[in-house]
């Protein structure tokens, strides 16, 4: 229009302004990152100043630092400086009130950003989730065998198939789905445990969190409060949680209606053995409000991620050491026929337990353990000061220490089995044991309370798998090298194996094992 003509000279500026502002923001962010980044702790050796190097090869940096430094040392990471503390100090620190679980994990989990609420739920120091698992889930385990047995059998049949000829599968994806089904059967029951929308959420949210955290680490700290709104990975997290709330809300409404109906008739409301009820009951007892859907996603994500990784590693190890398969099957068949599905039966499966524990040692998921934040200065027995505000974690070097594990590079499925045969050692060296030479589940007051459920779930699934299927690597292929990211080690997502139903019928009925004698 003619009356705009005098201002046409401003048109190029109108287009250039957003680019100019974006450029200035980026420059300012890099300035802040360079000049206002967290400072390392004084008087503790620095092994690496390069946070990009930690991003690429943190696993190796930890190993190198352990060999070079006799005590603590520091590594610069994308979320600040980390102090690696030798495992010999874990006993003196395990009950120290100045070490916070939440403060040790909040920065790495990015809990202040929308979309990461499930991580925030897992990182609190208030013991809510620990109470749900320790009091509600663990004390209900004896009532859950039938659900875990049934869902693992049905899920394996549907996912792994019933073919008696070799089929090639991407086993990690399939195991993720099976574990999600079994875990959801326990946490939520029917119909959600077989609802594909729910299964997609709990399986994919773990992957999405990993990818979102990776992108956030690659983003300069000063830009994160802005950039996270636009990253596809963080958008996906928010979508997952919205979908989870949509699915969980009707279940909450049903529970609320059942409670109101019971009270209206003067009855005590019936307790339900599922995560929704557990969380409502614990939150009411603690006088706090929670987002139930977020906490259910958090609990599911934690359980599925670890169990899937261990289960996948177990199957791959069966391919690499097939000589152990017949002995494992013989133990499972004998004990199930003798005592059926009980806690004591699982306890007596010493060879299976030893096999799983050795898999976790040989294919450790993390090179470090027990992230903690110092809320006050902490002084170690050798005089090292861990300053207030610093983040520490312990090395897990004993799993490869010849003094604790002779010939540590060798996979020995009998390793813990032999140790438990020694007098006075029968109850030690178990998969669920908390020991300084086996810290897969942490140590001290924040040790994983869900390890007993993981133990039961893993053993039931492995019993089912071993009695029904044969497995091998794809002919001509080797086990692929694990993926290393920071201090984590993971099975590659595209790993393949071949599976077929065994030529003979299972020697024991998993639903009624004693009647099979």
From Swiss-Prot:
UniProt KW keywords: Glycoprotein, Heme, Iron, Membrane, Metal-binding, Monooxygenase, Oxidoreductase, Transmembrane, Transmembrane helix
Listed PROSITE patterns: CYTOCHROME_P450
Pathway(s) the chain acts in: Mycotoxin biosynthesis
InterPro entries in the record: Cyt_P450 (IPR001128), Cyt_P450_CS (IPR017972), Cyt_P450_E_grp-IV (IPR002403), Cyt_P450_sf (IPR036396)
EC number: 1.-.-.-
Membrane association type: Single-pass membrane protein
Residues the record marks as carrying a glycan: 204
One Gene Ontology term, aspect cellular component: membrane
Principal location listed in the UniProt entry: membrane
Function: Cytochrome P450 monooxygenase; part of the gene cluster that mediates the biosynthesis of the diterpene glucoside brassicicene C. In the first step of the brassicicene C biosynthesis, the bifunctional diterpene synthase bsc8 that possesses both prenyl transferase and terpene cyclase activity, converts isopentenyl diphosphate and dimethylallyl diphosphate into geranylgeranyl diphosphate (GGDP) that is further converted into fusicocca-2,10(14)-diene, the first precursor for brassicicene C.
Protein name as annotated: Cytochrome P450 monooxygenase bsc11
Origin species: Alternaria brassicicola (Dark leaf spot agent)
């Amino acid at each position: 229009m003619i009356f705009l003509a005098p201002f046409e000279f401003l048109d190029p500026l109108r287009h250039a302004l957003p680019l100019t502002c974006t450029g200035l923001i980026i420059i300012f962010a890099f300035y802040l990152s360079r000049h206002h980044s967290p400072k390392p702790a004084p008087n503790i050796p620095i092994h690496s100043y390069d946070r990009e190097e930690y991003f690429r090869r943190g696993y190796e940096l930890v190993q190198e630092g352990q060999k070079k430094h006799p005590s603590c040392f520091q590594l610069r990471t994308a979320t600040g400086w980390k102090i690696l503390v030798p495992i010999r100090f874990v006993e003196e620190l395990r009950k120290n009130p100045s070490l916070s679980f939440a403060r040790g994990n909040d920065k790495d989990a990015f809990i202040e950003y929308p979309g990461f609420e499930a991580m925030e739920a897992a990182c609190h120091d208030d013991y809510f989730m620990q109470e749900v698992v320790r009091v509600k889930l663990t004390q209900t385990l004896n009532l859950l065998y039938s659900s875990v047995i049934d869902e693992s059998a049905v899920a394996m049949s549907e996912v792994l198939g019933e073919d008696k000829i070799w089929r090639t599968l991407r086993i990690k994806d399939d195991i993720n789905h099976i574990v999600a089904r079994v875990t959801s059967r326990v946490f939520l029951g029917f119909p959600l445990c077989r609802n594909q929308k729910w299964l997609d959420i709990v399986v994919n949210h773990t992957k999405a969190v990993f990818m979102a955290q990776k992108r956030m680490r690659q983003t300069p700290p000063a830009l994160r409060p802005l950039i996270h709104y636009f990253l596809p990975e963080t958008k996906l997290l928010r979508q997952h949680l919205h979908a989870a709330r949509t699915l969980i809300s009707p279940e909450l409404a049903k529970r609320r209606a059942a409670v109101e109906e019971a009270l209206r008739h003067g009855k005590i409301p019936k307790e339900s053995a599922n995560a929704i009820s557990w969380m409502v009951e614990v939150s009411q007892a603690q006088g706090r409000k929670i987002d139930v859907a977020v906490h259910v996603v958090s609990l599911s994500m934690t359980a599925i991620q670890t169990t899937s990784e261990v289960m996948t590693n177990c199957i791959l190890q069966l391919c690499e050491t097939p000589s152990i398969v017949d002995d494992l099957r013989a133990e499972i068949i004998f004990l199930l026929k003798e005592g059926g599905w009980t806690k004591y039966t699982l306890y007596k499966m010493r060879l299976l337990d030893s096999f799983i524990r050795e898999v976790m040692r040989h294919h450790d998921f993390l090179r470090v353990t027990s992230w903690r934040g110092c809320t006050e200065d902490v002084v170690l027995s050798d005089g090292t000061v861990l300053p207030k505000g610093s983040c520490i974690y312990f090395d897990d070097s004993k799993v490869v220490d010849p003094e604790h594990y002779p010939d540590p590079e060798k996979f020995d499925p009998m390793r813990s089995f032999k140790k438990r045969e020694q007098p006075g050692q029968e109850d030690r060296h178990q998969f669920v044991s908390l020991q300084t030479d086996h810290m897969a589940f942490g140590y001290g007051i924040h040790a994983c309370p869900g390890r007993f459920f993981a133990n039961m779930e893993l053993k039931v699934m492995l019993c089912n798998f071993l009695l029904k299927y044969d497995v091998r690597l794809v002919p001509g292929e080797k086990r692929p090298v694990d993926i290393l990211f920071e201090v984590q080690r993971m099975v590659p997502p595209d790993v393949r194996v071949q599976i077929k139903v065994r030529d003979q019928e299972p020697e024991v009925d998993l639903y009624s094992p004693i009647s099979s004698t």
